[in-house]
A protein has these predicted regions:
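Conserved NTP-binding catalytic cores of kinases and kinase-like/nucleotidyltransferase enzymes
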Residues: 1-61, 170-172, 264-273
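An alpha-helical support segment within catalytic cores of ATP-dependent transferases
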Residues: 2-4, 111-160, 170-171, 223
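Active-site acidic catalytic loop and adjacent metal/ATP-binding pocket
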Residues: 24-29, 64, 143-189
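A conserved alpha-helical element in kinase catalytic cores
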Residues: 32-73, 81-106
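A glycine-centered beta->alpha junction motif in the catalytic cores
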Residues: 43, 71-92, 105-112, 122-132, ...
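Soluble or luminal CAZymes and related metallo-dependent hydrolases
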Residues: 44-45, 94-98, 137, 210-217
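Active-site Asp-x-Gly
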Residues: 170-219, 223-229, 234, 253-260
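ATP/Mg2+ or Mg2+-diphosphate-binding catalytic cores
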Residues: 243-273
């Protein structure tokens, strides 16, 4: 329940609670009347998101106003356009440009990173040592992941889960990221999650699995982020495969992740053949 934090931080409720699989979000007003969002996490890993949000200090990410245990008080996004709808409605290149712009800000050089970040070798442990039998495609992706992890460059703190529902419109402050993981490693990895979205943001969405969309995104991200095509493709295959393993290990299907992984593997094969 949020009551202790509502009292301590002198917050007033300002809308219905939003329940997610990992906690609750409470729209609130600060003592000066400005809008904010109180997030109370029930997931232990989710509670670590404050580390990077506080380190970014509002540059490319939502600003943290207060933090105490599972409770995180942040500035609140404004109603309006969202990247999920933008992509679905045929403006995917615009959504991709916004996501790339946010990552450029998050990846800017800063001081010493916060404590408690985990490296990508740990993040990929379920693909490297899988809890399920892997298909030939996933075995290929596992090999590509090992290659990518061994060849990491430009290591820095990463968002780890930057997709269309994790970048919101904050009005005059622009588009900002929320809900980071606590990982660090090759910056190219941070551009991979967008390739399986917005399809994973909700049922019935079919954007990321379109061959033309995949190719357009690939070209756009390579140019915007200054990434070589093979390097990005290896990370896309690895990232999509890791997510697929998580789905499959939970007994769920993973059609989006498998389709994206296959497109990445196919393009790598074409380039080397």
């Amino acid at each position: 329940m949020p009551e202790p934090h509502l009292t301590t931080w002198q917050l007033a409720r300002d809308g219905d609670v939003i329940t997610t699989p990992r906690g609750q979000l409470y729209p609130v007003r600060l003592p000066d009347g400005s809008a904010a969002m109180l997030k109370v996490s029930t997931d232990a890993e989710e509670r670590n998101g404050h580390r990077l949000l506080r380190w970014w200090d509002g540059d490319g990410a939502a600003r943290v106003l207060a933090h105490d245990g599972p409770a995180l008080l942040m500035e609140r996004a404004v109603p309006g356009d969202c990247l999920r709808d933008m992509s679905i409605q045929g403006r995917d290149a615009q959504a991709t440009a916004i996501l790339c712009g946010v990552l450029e800000r998050l990846h800017r050089p800063r001081g010493a990173p916060p404590d408690g970040l985990l490296d990508l070798n740990w993040w990929f442990s379920d693909l490297l040592t899988p809890p399920i039998a892997l298909s030939p495609l996933l075995e290929q992706c596992r090999s590509l992941a090992m290659t990518a992890l061994e060849a990491q460059i430009e290591a820095r703190p990463l968002h780890g889960d930057l997709h269309h529902d994790n970048v919101l419109d904050f009005g005059a402050r622009g588009w900002l990221a929320i809900d980071p993981k606590r990982v660090q490693g090759d910056r190219a990895f941070d551009y991979t999650v967008l390739f399986t979205n917005p399809d994973l943001c909700g049922p019935g969405i079919q954007v990321a699995t379109d061959e033309a969309v995949f190719e357009q995104r690939l070209q756009q991200v390579c140019v915007r982020a200054g990434l070589e095509r093979p390097r990005l493709l290896r990370w896309i295959a690895a990232s999509a495969a890791l997510s697929a393993v998580w789905f499959l290990a939970d007994g769920d299907a993973a059609p989006v992740n498998l389709a994206v992984a296959a497109m990445a593997v196919q393009r790598l094969a074409e380039a080397s053949g």
